[in-house]
Amino acid sequence: MGKIGFHSVRRAQPRLFLSLLTAILAVGCMEPTHEAFREPTGTPMPRITLLTYNTLHGLEPSGMTVRASESQEVRQARLDLQFRQLSLIQPDVMLLQEVNPLPEMAERYIAAMKRSGLDYQSVHQVDACGVRFAPGLAVVPGLNNGLVVLAKAPLRLRKVEGLKLSGGFGRCDDYMGFQTGELRYALIAEVENPNTERKVLTVSLHLHSGFERNAFFIQKIHEAVKAGKARQEDFTEIVAAMEQDQERRLEEIRLLVKEIDTLYAKGPYLGVLVGGDFNFEPDDPEYRELERAGLKDTYAMARPETEIYSLDPQRNIIAGHGTQEVPSTLRAAIRRLPESQQQKILEGYQRGITQARRVDFMFLMRKPSDSATGCFRQELFGESEAVSAAPGSDHYGVLVTYMADASQCG
C-alpha cells in the first residue's frame, strides 16, 4: 500500500480552534465501539479530525436522464481507494457530498469502516433523485445522489433536517421524490460528545454549480472592456448568466444562515461546523457573505503561507477530464456573437477552469467567549497513492485536525 499524499499547512493558533471542538467532540480515549449510555466525564481527547469530501457520484447527463461516466470497474477501484484512505485517517466527523445512491451508499461507507474495526453512524439527505414513485420504482433507477454526515463512536449523531436551499417545486427523499430541475440541500446534523453531553451543529452541503469561476470571469470581462479589448454589449448576456448563478448561491447561503441562527438560538449548541463543495472561491461575494454571518474559514484562521487547492485539474486527472465540458448556459449566452469571438471566449473559459482553485471549505461559527488554546492543521485528503495514477475523486478532501497541545503543530 502506498502512502497517502498530504499537502499540509501547519500553524499554531492559540486563540481560535476552540474549546468548541475540544469540549464537544473530544472524548477522552479512542474507543472502538459506541456506548448508548455513559456517565459524563468531561475528559477531552487531545486530537480531533474533521473531513469534508466531495466523493464524486460518477454520473453525467444524457438527454432527459443520466448515465454512468465511468465503468463499474473504475468506480469500484475509486471507492476501494476512498475506503482505504478513510480507514487510515479515521476522521471523527465526515461531511460527504455526491454520495450515490442513497441510502445504500452511506451504508457501504459504514461497512467499509467497520471492516477496519471502526464504528460509525450516518445520516443523509438526497438532493438529486429524478422521479421516484416507491422503493425500486424510479424513472432514473441509478440516481439517488446526496449528502452524508458520519460520526465515529463514541460520538452520537442525530439528523436535524434536510434543508432545501433552492430549486423551487419538487423534493427528494430516500425512496420517493419529484425533480424537474436542479435541487440543492443542506444536511444539518447534531453531533454530541457523550463525555461532556455538549453538542455542535454540523452541516454538509453542495451549493449550486452552473458557471464555474463566476467572479473570476466577470472580473476578466470588466478588465477587457476597460482596456478596449472587448465591447460591453457583447458580454451582457454572459455576465447576466454568471451573476444569476452567483445570486442563486447567495440566496442559498442566506437561507442556510437564517436556519442556523434559528437552531443556534433554540438549542444548547456550542458552535456550528459547515463543510462542503461551495462552488465559489475565497473572496468571492458568496465567501464574504458567510464571513459577514460570523462563519470563519478554518484555513484562513491558520494564516497559511501557501494555498491548498481542493480542485486541481493539473494534478488530478479526473478533474482534468471535467474541464473539457462547456456549460450549455455559456453556449446559449454567446450564440449571437460571431463564430471567431465565440471561439475566443470558449478558449478563455477553458484556460480559466483548468487553473487550480479552492472550492471546498470548512467554516466555523463559535461563541465569542470561547478562549481555547491549541493549534490546528489543514491538509488535502485523497491524493493519488504511489501505486495509483488516479485519486478517489475529482475533488481532494479538506481535512482539519485540532490538537490541544499547540507544540504539536510546530
Segments predicted by a language model, with ranges:
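Bacterial N-terminal signal peptides
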Residues: 17-27
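Sec-exported extracytoplasmic/periplasmic mature domains
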Residues: 87-91, 110-118, 155, 261-265, ...
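Structured beta-strand-rich core segments of catalytic domains in phosphoester-bond hydrolases
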Residues: 37-42, 97-215
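Acidic/histidine-rich helix-loop elements
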Residues: 52-78, 170-179, 208-248
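N-terminal, active-site-proximal structural segment of metallo-dependent hydrolase catalytic domains
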Residues: 28-116, 122-123, 127-135, 139, ...
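Active-site beta-strand/loop signature of hydrolases that rely on acidic residues for catalysis
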Residues: 49-55, 82-107, 150, 189, ...
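Bacterial N-terminal signal peptides that target proteins for export
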Residues: 4-17
